[in-house]
Amino acid sequence: MFIFNLNKKESKMNEDRIKGQWKQLAGKIKERYGIAHDEARKQVKKFHDSL
């Protein structure tokens, strides 16, 4: 069993770090998805233009 001896200030700092890291990860995922989505949309547009 783990026993954590953190005071409120340390606990809040850890919580803030975790939230910040989560936001960074979510932003990276959205950025990659957005880029992939935008490229796919451009390819579809090129295909339609070529018809």
Swiss-Prot record:
The UniProt entry, under InterPro entries, shows: YjbJ_sf
> What is the protein's species of origin?
Nitrosomonas europaea (strain ATCC 19718 / CIP 103999 / KCTC 2705 / NBRC 14298)
User: Hey, which family's this protein in?
Assistant: Belongs to the UPF0337 (CsbD) family.
Q: What is this protein called?
A: UPF0337 protein NE0131
